[in-house]
Amino acid sequence: MIQVLLVIICLEAFPYQGSSIILESGNVNDYEVVYPRKVTALSKGAVHPKYEDAMQYEFKVNGEPVVLHLEKNKGLFSEDYSEIHYSPDGREITTYPLVEDHCYYHGRIQNDADSSASISACNGLKGHFKLQGEMYLIEPFKLPDSEAHAVFKYENVEKEDEAPKMCGVTETNWESDEPIKKASLLNLTPEQQAYLDAKKYVEFVVVLDHGMYKKYKDDLDKIKRRIYEIVNTMNEMFIPLNICVALTGLEIWSKGDKINVTSESWFTLILFTNWRGADLLKRKSHDNAQLLTNTDFDGSTIGRAHIGSMCHPYLSVGIIQDYSPVNLLVASTMAHEMGHNLGMHHDNDTCTCGAPSCVMAAAISKDPSKLFSNCSQEYQRKYLIKNRPQCLLNKPLRTDIISPPVCGNELLEVGEECDCGTPENCRDPCCNATTCKLTPGSQCVEGLCCDQCRFRKTGTECRAAKHDCDLPESCTGQSADCPMDDFQRNGHPCQNNNGYCYNGKCPTMENQCIDLVGPKATVAEDSCFKDNQKGNDYGYCRKENGKKIPCEPQDVKCGRLYCNDNSPGQNNPCKCIYFPRNEDRGMVLPGTKCADGKVCSNRHCVDVATAY
């Protein structure tokens, strides 16, 4: 039995001298100082790696001893993980850091079944853990030759801004709860069931704007550590959904922004969407990207994303404001926006996750959550059944996720052609469970273009077109995977020439009126749109430094949207929607037809050929 000395020091005698963003802010009301003691599990004389796969630490919380069990998060980075920043003269600098022996862990508290932890062990212990239903943060002091750490409850961190923080996603034409309740009862085809059962992988890229670079004093290492800690927590949140979020790239706009990052979150999302599809995806293969910005979005918005867009070459993105020094809060927001990409909508009052608030709540709770609700899980399940996004089946473990290959663990790893589990449990005729190689004559195990262990014939449709702006995909005869979901070129006429395709959708004013006002709504007369020349809350085109800029006469149909309600008892032929906390809502969406042959682009009504 190892004798462990645990010391708690009176706070008055131990002024903070560390480097923590949270503690340095002076916003922590109360914390205790502890000395975590590592309890080694390695035998005497064994070679100690720098960061072991599993570790235990003992320390006290509120005078009671706790044992923190940690396991290295081997799914955090992909092997081809790369980092990009820019030199002062604008040159792109790409590096491939060695991340095999990283220091990021998930964990739990001994004898607490409801506990969890996300910890960086790079220089002391930094992160958070849940103990007896309460969230605690732990951070090391920056003191010479000291193992002292601060432990404090999340509730003891004073909030600089008590205003509610909201997700900017505001679609109102969401499906009712009834179909969601029935989603788990659907009769699934064998292919659908196989897709649901397969482990999913999101190859994830984080982009930081120039404001973030300046916020962290041009310190690339400090920025990287923060992102690693955040994604480590994100990764943990998706484990119960059988999804591994693997960081495959980090891009830092150290020279200057690649897009116009503005306080109008919807506009910034559109610009980042276009940049990702036209630029980033061509340089770095990935499934999903998020922009983390220091820009303060208008109103209470702190994030925004496209719903049901995972794997889309443009729309699989989100944008997030770095609004808090608490990594858990930002990680929860990033997980929330990725949840939208995976088909999840906001929770309502009937949704539960066993905590006061869940990840997909529209407003960020004072009690941060790491749990997805039952509604979120059913939304995601229904989205996966209907769309079966193929990029999630790309198994980064084959060449990317760092983990020693073990045949029989049902994870496809380096050197394996398949892995169906142990010989006793494997029922797959395409895979040899003993060797993790394909059986003789087999070409594949699973995929939309795999049928009875063979590739489907060239030209076999594997994904039908969903609407006017989508395109069908067909098997190549050379792969088990259905090709990446593609869509009509931007500017292609859609919905009987009432609109033009834009990033795979057909935005029309009529549909936007129905979404905002109600099922009987129609687009208002042209005269109503003249109010957009006033430059006030109810009529403008753009904002500059918080000031509403009037529309030019030719651009009035690219500002605030005006609708005719047409509901019984309503007599408002020029109705517009204005939300002070989310001013972007109610504006005509980018790509919307504003005249024959013209679309809204950057809040101007321009020729389709000019826009695209």
Swiss-Prot record:
Catalytic class of the enzyme: hydrolase
Pfam families in UniProt: ADAM_CR, Disintegrin, Pep_M12B_propep, Reprolysin
Principal localisation: secreted
EC number: 3.4.24.-
Binding positions (Ca(2+) 1): E203, D287, C391, N394
Binding site residues for Ca(2+) 3: D470, L471, E473, D485
Residues that make up the propeptide removed upon maturation: 21-187
pH-activity note: Optimum pH is 8.0-9.0.
Keywords: Blood coagulation cascade activating toxin, Calcium, Disulfide bond, Glycoprotein, Hemostasis impairing toxin, Hydrolase, Metal-binding, Metalloprotease, Platelet aggregation inhibiting toxin, Protease, Prothrombin activator, Secreted, Signal, Toxin, Zinc, Zymogen
Signal peptide coordinates: 1-20
Cofactor note: Binds 1 zinc ion per subunit.
Gene Ontology cellular component terms for the protein in this record: extracellular region; plasma membrane
Domain Disintegrin: 404-490
Subunit structure: Monomer.
Name of the protein in question: Zinc metalloproteinase-disintegrin-like berythractivase
Organism: Bothrops erythromelas (Caatinga lance head)
